[in-house]
Amino acid sequence: GGPYAFGL
């Protein structure tokens, strides 16, 4: 959910 390349 964050602006990074992760599914967080």
Swiss-Prot record:
Keyword Secreted: yes
Keywords per UniProt: Amidation, Neuropeptide, Secreted
Residues that span the membrane, as ranges: none
One cellular component term from this protein's GO annotations in UniProt: extracellular region
Major subcellular site: secreted
Protein localization: Secreted
GO BP term, pick one: neuropeptide signaling pathway
Residues where Leucine amide is found: 8
Keyword flag Flavoprotein: no
Protein family per UniProt: Belongs to the allatostatin family.
Job of this protein: May act as a neurotransmitter or neuromodulator.
Record's protein name: Carcinustatin-9
